[in-house]
Amino acid sequence: YGFFIFYNASPDYAQQIPANGSNQTRGLVTWTETKILGQAAYQYSVNIYDDKARLIQVKSKNQTGGADLITTQYSWSGQPLVMLQKQIKSGANAQTSFTVTKFIYDDLGRVLRTDKKIQHTNVGGNVLPSVYTTVSQVEYDALGQLKQKTVGSKKNPANNTYYSPRQPLQEQAYEYNIRGWLLNVNKGYMNNANTNQYFAMELGYDKNASLSTFAPLYNGNIAGMLWKSEGDQQRRKYNFSYDAANRLTAGAFAQYVSGSGSSAVFNISANIDYSVSGLTYDANGNLKTMTQKGLILNASPTIDQFTYNYKNTEYSNKLAKVTDSAAAASSGKLGDFKDGNVGATDDYSYDVNGNLTADLNKGISAISYN
């Protein structure tokens, strides 16, 4: 454990790392080797356990010929308390980095805060900082639901030190309805600027979001969603439709134009449309058709128009073929699904156990299993 000895103290409610791993490892994975195709070398990994069968250290060989080590110290109740990660880069420009992660829990065993220290050969004189930096902190409501999460810590540009008391880089606030369903994330940011929030989202069930009118649904289905991101500050939404079996049939996309509250106007006048429509299903609930629009050079044509066929003349749940009839799909440059097997031949093949043995859309003609 060498490098970890200096950190093997006894913080509150913690157990020290044992000097040696346990020999009682029956039924536990202690060693793995992974073959790298085209090379003679293997990548190996060794697992070390304590006498309670808890994984206390993993040592593995990395692609540089160096080693990655992860050592974990547990609390008396078995929760990870401190984790030390050591990465050694061998060869040219050899480097070593340490990352120490500390977890703080409340009386109910829930993670409240995650702190880190980082040391690197080429940074800050290769010295481990004396204090931790908080990377995330969470707060729960009386029902145990996540109420607020803060991420990162800001530095004072005047002296390049972290603010005290801490100022987070980002804040995330969560609200729920009486059933515990998520209603929104950062609702205040939807209509106002906030330097510590970069994303907002609202979900509509039986009630509207703050800037949109959704047809209310009383069966738990999400009637629509509204969101806003930091990049362009634009507010966008989807209105969802379902069939009698509560299966999604369409998602109508629109962008905010003007107005407020239930009078807010959303449309696709900016020629941006990511709507999904025409979702149909077979008797087994398998998807049969789907149409999707997307943005191409300031226009939003249909980029996907799928038809799904299944094995055994549709009397199966095994997908046989996907046909894309959209005109925009012929270029194959959109980064989405590519219909790489045009014709009557099935796209997908399976063995007797149901394992995929061919995917002609991706140019994979054979897959074998041991």
What are the functions of these language-model segments?
Residues 2-50, 55-370:
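Acidic/glycine-rich beta-solenoid
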